[in-house]
C-alpha cells in the first residue's frame, strides 16, 4: 500500500516549513505517480 500524502499544517510558520512541505509532497507524488506494471 502507498503511504498517505504528508499532512498539511493549517498555518505555515516559516518559509522553510512551506518548502519542506512542498518537498515532501513532490516526493509523495513521484512515488504515487510511478506507473505500475
Curated annotation (Swiss-Prot):
Keywords of this entry: Amidation, Neurotoxin, Secreted, Toxin
GO molecular function ontology, one term from the record: hormone activity
PROSITE patterns noted in UniProt: PANCREATIC_HORMONE_1 (PS00265), PANCREATIC_HORMONE_2 (PS50276)
InterPro entries: Pancreatic_hormone-like, Pancreatic_hormone-like_CS
Chain positions found as Phenylalanine amide: 37
Keyword Secreted (UniProt): yes
Entries under Pfam families matching the protein: Hormone_3 (PF00159)
Expression by tissue: Expressed by the venom duct.
Subcellular localization: Secreted
GO cellular component: extracellular region
Function statement: Causes hyperactivity such as jumping, rapid circling and tail flicking, when intraventricularly injected into mice brain.
Note: The mature peptide does not contain cysteine residue.
Family indicated by similarity: Belongs to the NPY family.
This protein's name: Neuropeptide Y1-like conopeptide
Species this chain originates from: Conus betulinus
Amino acid at each position: 500500500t502507498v503511504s498517505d500524502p504528508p499532512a498539511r499544517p493549517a498555518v505555515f510558520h516559516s518559509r522553510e516549513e512551506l518548502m519542506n512541505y512542498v518537498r515532501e509532497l513532490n516526493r509523495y507524488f513521484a512515488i504515487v505517480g510511478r506507473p505500475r506494471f
